Amino acid sequence: MKTIAVLTSGGDAPGMNAAIRAVVRTAIEKGINVKGIQRGYSGLINGEIFDMNRHSVSDIIQRGGTILRTARCPEFLKEEVRQKAANVLRVFGIDGLVVIGGNGSFMGAQKLSKLGVKTVGLPGTIDNDLPYTDYTIGFDTTLNTVLDAINKLRDTSTSHERVSIIEVMGRDCGDIALFSGIAGGAESVIIPEIGYDFNELCKNILEGKLRGKMHNLIILAEGVGGAAELAKKVEEVTGIETRSTILGHIQRGGSPSAFDRMLASRMGVKAVEVLMEGKTSRVIGIKEGKIMDQDIDEALAVPRSFNKELYDIANMLSK
């Protein structure tokens, strides 16, 4: 293993820079050359590749986003495009590729490995929607961003004695809503894994009002969606002023938390070690606090499980 490359793909996540830093500095320490690929698979296809050194990753561990930029690349679904990408890697003398991203990025790495490219994936996605690992890079920071918004919205909701519906990211996985709902003391959490009863929701709001609650916070995952429409319906039925807030892309930005910096650093080191061991088509994850690697085919085949215990806790503590 003489030269490896690293890229970030798909949606950005806080902690990606910490992972890049760990990959670059670990590889250099082990005598391996490192190249950076800009703009994900799109940049790989176009040969946007440059040499990296220790200085390339100075003062980036605290920065959100990704210094390598990122992009979505739908054309990577085509066999001829992936073949071109594999050829580009060979032309640049790259022996191994570290891919930092989510499900779609891992599928790209999986396809490249079938073409003889040694690949290792790091889970970089705020949604925490890769079931083979307990946590993904960026999830914890996003929770803290959402929690900050919840705290501020509670202040104004209490002042006006209103209902606040906060829509957070999470198209297929409701972990952001579920975890932030518990940590933020929300009265209701609505996630795609479990449907909700609108009448029951309104009943809970009214019962809370009778018990003297000064506000009511509802955390809604974008996979369920329709925060503005839901707010309108809630106000019509309950007669209580209701406002909706969509947090949007603010959830992707910001300096990564200590947890995400540690997680990304540990995973970055492990990725280089896995490549040096001659393994390929692997992904890095964390299980019960331990950094591990797993075959990418097996990882992508792990069914998504729903944490019913946490959901029950959210409901119990909200009353």
From Swiss-Prot:
What residues bind ATP, as annotated? Answer: 11, 72-73, 102-105
A GO cellular component annotation here is: 6-phosphofructokinase complex
Keywords, comma-separated and alphabetical: Allosteric enzyme, ATP-binding, Cytoplasm, Glycolysis, Kinase, Magnesium, Metal-binding, Nucleotide-binding, Transferase
Q: Which residues form the active site?
A: 127
**What cofactors does the UniProt entry give for this protein?**
Mg(2+)
Positions binding Mg(2+) in this chain are 103
Q: Please give the positions of the paired cysteines in each disulfide bond.
A: none
Enzyme class label: transferase
| Quaternary data | Homotetramer.
Q: Which PANTHER family match?
A: ATP-DEPENDENT 6-PHOSPHOFRUCTOKINASE (PTHR13697:SF4), PHOSPHOFRUCTOKINASE (PTHR13697)
Which purpose does this protein serve, as stated in its record?
Answer: Catalyzes the phosphorylation of D-fructose 6-phosphate to fructose 1,6-bisphosphate by ATP, the first committing step of glycolysis.
Protein name, UniProt field: ATP-dependent 6-phosphofructokinase
What taxonomic ancestry is recorded?
Bacteria, Bacillati, Bacillota, Clostridia, Eubacteriales
